[in-house]
Amino acid sequence: MAARWCFALLLALSAAAAGAGAKRTWEPVIRMPGEVVEEEVATVPRGSEGTEEEEKDGVGTRWAVLVAGSSGYGNYRHQADVCHAYQILRKGGLKEENIVVFMYDDIANNILNPRPGVIVNHPQGEDVYAGVPKDYTGDEVTAKNFYAVLLGNKTAVTGGSRKVIDSKPNDHIFIFYSDHGGPGVLGMPNLPYLYAADFMKVLQEKHASNTYAKMVIYVEACESGSIFEGLMPEDLNIYVTTASNAEESSWGTYCPGMEPSPPSEYITCLGDLYSVSWMEDSETHNLKEESIKKQYEVVKKRTSDMNSYGAGSHVMEYGDRTFKDDKLYLYQGFDPANAEVKNKLSWEGPKAAVNQRDADLLFLWRRYELLHDKSEEKLKALREISDTVMHRKLLDSSVDLVGKLLFGFGNGPSVLQAVRPSGQPLVDDWDCLKRMVRIFESHCGPLTQYGMKHMRAFANICNNGISGASMKEASIATCSSHNSGRWSSLVQGYSA
């Protein structure tokens, strides 16, 4: 039954995507890493261009932190986004030593990857994986390491290259984060998640250290606006844009069965809508002429599904907006090949996309479809789909029942789903939020990257003054009969 439900859902998603607009005209502009145009060699030798530009424009050093906060082949798009961003920054003159990359690194050589050792971020795109440094991979991709890197604290880093943002007062910093998210949290492949209040403390500490002039942050995740809503100060010299507001999904794109579709051998989405929007804009414009404000407007329009929001989200701004007229080269560098570039990228009308959480199911179903009938692998894939769908439904019903036990069967759902007015943070007591999440996970199993969407429910439990003892009692009553198995928090870990 669960598998049939999943099939119907995915069929509906594919059908909706099929009618999503006219065909894109794409003129490839991504070159293989190491493939250099002759004019670039003559004008700005690779490896020295960053220093020369910094000396000329007096902006200090450009630094970047790139984070893919997921793992697994079904999340291919997040690492593809980050690898693509790395290639853009390198072509823009940022030196490898000034770019820190976080990615689990389980995609390029994954057994499911039809092009071993290659990652692409567009249906006609070139490899974006070659040359990307393995700064922090596998178990090293953690919120703790991310904070330490941003603060330039080598002693707090565990494993990895130990590369950190050792920035100075005149330097500019660019951060790009691509992953799943939920109200108040961003995912990490190794728990715990990144919590908004913790991230704000790190940004404030970075500002207090007087080790940068300005910072720009781009975040791709569901409910990513909730990381900054009501929390992001305007006096830190930090400008932020997010793929979505505080209460909606962000969107995957270049997905199987959609238009434009990846090559037929791919069974997963190649990119995320907000992410590819800013990157395809950056690599097809002269970034000494294009401003932060202009890119925001372009990305906002494309990510909104041409202002229809049918298969799109609201790109948001937070923080200090006084320097939106700054040119993008101050943060992303400048590629001489784009000095006289005209916009090579043409996209007319709405394009197909799938929300981040359904993209995971889409991958599982496409994998199932391609396996040989009656094979053990196909049966195993079907069981995984059924297990995943049933666990999602169990999570949803468990959170719902906890709310009903705490607030009454009539009021529970509305209390858990309540959205605070714009300008207010998700929760007043972030430590309470973490406690409530741990109590729930101790008795009902981990939230998983899907269950992150329920963070608002736990925040509202805190906002309504529920005690830890009452939360524990409700969680036990709800989940005492559950057989968690591989979904147990003892196996998966705790997200708080």
UniProtKB/Swiss-Prot annotation:
Glycans are attached at N153. InterPro entries: AE, Legum_prodom, Legumain_prodom_sf, Peptidase_C13. The active site is at H180, C222 (nucleophile). Expressed in germinating seeds. It is an enzyme of class 3 (hydrolase). Keywords: Disulfide bond, Glycoprotein, Hydrolase, Protease, Signal, Thiol protease. Disulfide bonds join C255-C269, C432-C462, C444-C479. It comes from the Eukaryota. The record marks C269 as: Required for post-translational maturation and enzyme activity. GO terms for biological process: proteolysis involved in protein catabolic process; vacuolar protein processing. Residues 23-57 form a propeptide. One of its GO terms (molecular function) is cysteine-type endopeptidase activity. Residues 1-22 form the signal peptide. Induction: Down-regulated by treatment with gibberellin (GA3) (at protein level). Induced by hydrogen peroxide. GO terms for cellular component: vacuole. Its EC number is 3.4.22.-. Asparaginyl endopeptidase that may act as an activator of REP1. Belongs to the peptidase C13 family. This is Asparaginyl endopeptidase Rep2.
